[in-house]
């Protein structure tokens, strides 16, 4: 991890870590890296996004880049526009699910996949050097504005077909998804009820679409007797789902269900997920001809493995899904359309979810300054291997140790000053016992680091 880029691009507090001055330099660095070309730029609804976008575009133009500004746009729309306009790259101004005082910058390749760590490292090198490409007055890049929403919906309707109409409640969380997700659902032929659908940087609910933040969505689904509720984070690269009974469907369960549906839709193949995904996915997709491949946390790692192995679906247990037949950009909006197609073909989610194996999953966060993370992980690795009776070790991203009926993942956050502990066990007592031991170990490691 470099000075600027984490697991999801550049992210931090506006006017502290992420400033207009930095955005200007990032624009220059991207233009220098590309040597010109064409770049699509979009932003989320945060109050600071317009300021950062303007600075970034200035930097791009100064290096001779042609900029297509699509304005307020969910991340999936930026990824789609990159391919639609045959751009060399794309940039999104967003902090995704982080609180409103945060913002960030994420760069995308011409195929819709996020920049890899190696590509980001090269951008960092250019940023640090200050040796930016400069063009004369008559070669400054051109700026034009575009709106790819109509084309996005048209293409999506070619891939997703419904036989019946459903009542869908869409909670966009005041984020960028509000300009697209409800409209796609309506064009699919559904009756749409919108919540938090006015774009605003003053978010009404917590942006991460989880059981707590979606209590309003769940209540609306029950009251309106809707078939499903769909929610997004700030840039709509994630999806959260509430079933027809008004219950939030755990990320692990939805990941398994949609992976299984993709296997039914496209035939047997490889499913890519991350090291923090549990046993349920493997157990659910194996009978359907699915082979699970695990990789580092982050959509770029998932997209990279999908491309390498020709996988048919990739997703994280955070509601981040990548559908390679559509794009290599994580897309919560297109995912919502697929959820409706799954309901149309297989039945209510409440019934489908009962088929997914359930294990006990616990998560914890331990505060840890960023400068202590590397040393703390060294201590954790050494102590965890001594303290737990494990059968398998995966160290591609943090430390994951497994036994036949449990696993634990110790991993430093790439976006926050915390250490994350994720674990799963077959029983609640075992899960609590493991978490108590794991938390104690991590707190001691941070203290010693």
From Swiss-Prot:
The keyword Nucleotidyltransferase does not apply. It catalyses: alpha-D-glucosamine 1-phosphate = D-glucosamine 6-phosphate. The active site is at residue 96. Keywords: Isomerase, Magnesium, Metal-binding, Phosphoprotein. Binds 1 Mg(2+) ion per subunit. GO terms for biological process: carbohydrate metabolic process. The keyword Metal-binding applies. The modification Phosphoserine is found at residue 96. Its EC number is 5.4.2.10. Mg(2+) binds at residues 96, 233, 235, 237. It comes from the Archaea. GO terms for molecular function: magnesium ion binding; phosphoglucosamine mutase activity. Pfam families: PGM_PMM_I, PGM_PMM_II, PGM_PMM_III, PGM_PMM_IV. Catalyzes the conversion of glucosamine-6-phosphate to glucosamine-1-phosphate. Belongs to the phosphohexose mutase family. This is Probable phosphoglucosamine mutase. It comes from Thermococcus gammatolerans (strain DSM 15229 / JCM 11827 / EJ3). The gene is glmM.
């Amino acid at each position: 991890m470099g000075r600027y880029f984490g697991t999801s691009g550049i992210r931090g507090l506006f006017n502290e870590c992420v400033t207009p001055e930095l955005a200007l330099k990032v624009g220059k660095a991207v233009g220098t890296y590309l040597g010109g070309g064409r770049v699509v730029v979009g932003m989320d609804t945060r109050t600071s996004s317009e300021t950062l976008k303007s600075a970034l575009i200035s930097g791009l133009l100064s290096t001779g880049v042609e900029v297509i500004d699509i304005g307020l746009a969910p991340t999936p729309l930026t990824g789609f526009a990159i391919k639609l306009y045959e751009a060399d790259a794309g940039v999104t101004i967003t902090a995704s699910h982080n609180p409103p005082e945060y913002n960030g910058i994420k760069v995308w390749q011409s195929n819709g996949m996020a920049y890899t760590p190696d590509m980001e490292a090269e951008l960092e090198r250019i940023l640090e050097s200050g040796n930016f490409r400069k063009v004369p007055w008559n070669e400054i890049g051109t700026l034009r504005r575009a709106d790819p929403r109509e084309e996005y919906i048209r293409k999506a309707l070619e891939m997703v077909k419904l036989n019946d109409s459903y009542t869908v409640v869409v909670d966009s969380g005041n984020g960028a998804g509000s300009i697209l997700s409800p409209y796609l659902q309506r064009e699919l032929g559904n009756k749409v009820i919108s919540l938090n659908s006015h774009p605003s940087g003053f978010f009404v609910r917590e942006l991460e679409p989880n059981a707590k933040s979606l209590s309003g969505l769940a209540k609306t689904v029950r009251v309106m007797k809707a078939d499903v509720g769909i929610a997004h984070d700030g840039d709509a690269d994630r999806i959260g789902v509430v079933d027809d009974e008004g219950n939030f469907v755990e990320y692990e369960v939805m990941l398994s269900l949609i992976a299984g549906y993709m296997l039914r839709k496209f035939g047997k193949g490889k499913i890519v997920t991350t090291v923090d995904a549990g046993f349920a996915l493997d157990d659910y997709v194996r009978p359907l001809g699915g082979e699970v491949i695990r990789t580092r946390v982050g959509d770029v790692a998932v997209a990279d493995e999908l491309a390498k192995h020709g996988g048919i679906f990739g997703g994280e247990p955070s509601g981040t899904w990548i559908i390679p037949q559509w794009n290599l950009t994580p897309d919560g909006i297109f995912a919502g359309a697929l959820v409706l197609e799954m309901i149309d073909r297989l039945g209510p989610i409440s019934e489908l979810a009962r088929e997914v194996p359930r294990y006990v999953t616990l998560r914890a966060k331990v505060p840890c300054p960023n400068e202590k993370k590397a040393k703390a992980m060294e201590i954790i690795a050494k102590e965890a291997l001594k303290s737990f009776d494990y059968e398998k070790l995966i160290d591609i991203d943090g430390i994951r140790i497994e036994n036949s009926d449990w696993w634990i993942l110790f991993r430093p956050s790439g976006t926050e000053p915390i250490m994350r502990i994720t674990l799963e066990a077959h029983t609640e007592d075992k899960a609590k016992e493991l978490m108590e031991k794991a938390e104690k170990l991590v707190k001691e490691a941070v203290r010693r680091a």
